[in-house]
Design a protein with these regions (language model features):
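Structured mid-to-C-terminal alpha-helical surface segments
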Residues: 1-213
């Protein structure tokens, strides 16, 4: 096992033989910067798919933070997998209540400030124009057998509809993003209380926004 060490993260790959005899891998990515999360983690019960009676507890990120980060990744990367996730969210009618929209929108703004910069209109256009060949190569082989036909145009339009619902930033959220562009970290413009305190000294913010200042 060989670790690849980058700026604030360590990566490696573990290879194994699956139950069908195929060679597969698990990719480990340890991010040493993104260790201060916005919302309090939650504990959920998980079930072993091979042993139905085997239930165990797992500590995980808040669903709002998970989906906020996922939608930020969609804007940044526009990969077929990200598009499919947003399409699924829209098809299932998830997160339509004002409170959940606000919680996710704040996370999108926060994680956008920790990225290399995203032109939102250009990102939405890239989603719309993602070639069908990319879906055939990168997404369709990952779907369960018998999933059924997936319409690329429907998928991309639903993904754009989904993420657009979370992009109407408030005045404070816009002010936060503008401050971040100038190297000023102002989490108080996004959050208050425990959330603001939790990310006040986030090393990722110092690395990406204030450049270590």
């Amino acid at each position: 096992m060989c670790w690849r060490i980058g700026n604030g993260n360590h990566q490696t790959e573990l290879y194994y033989r699956s139950a069908t005899g195929n060679r597969d891998k698990i990719k480990l990515d340890i991010n040493c910067l993104s260790r201060c999360h916005v919302y309090e983690p939650v504990v959920r019960d998980a079930r072993n798919p091979f042993l139905p009676d085997d239930v165990f507890s797992v500590r995980m990120l808040s669903e709002y933070e998970l989906f906020g980060a996922k939608l930020k990744a969609l804007l940044e990367r526009n990969t077929p997998r990200d598009i499919f996730d947003a399409y699924t969210m829209e098809q299932k009618g998830l997160y339509r209540v004002d409170e959940s929209v606000s919680l996710i929108r704040k996370c999108i703004a926060y994680y956008l400030s920790l990225s290399r910069g995203v032109d939102i209109e250009q990102a939405l256009e890239s989603i719309r124009k993602r070639p069908i060949q990319d879906f055939k190569k990168q997404l369709f082989p990952m779907l369960k057998t018998g999933y059924g036909f997936v319409d690329r145009d429907l998928m991309t339009s639903e993904a754009v509809k989904c993420v657009s619902r979370f992009l109407s930033f408030t005045e404070n959220e816009t002010a936060y993003l503008e401050a971040a562009k100038t190297g000023e970290y102002r989490p108080d413009l996004l959050f208050e209380g425990d959330s603001a305190e939790r990310i006040a000294e986030n090393p990722a913010a110092k690395f990406y926004i204030t450049k270590g200042a």
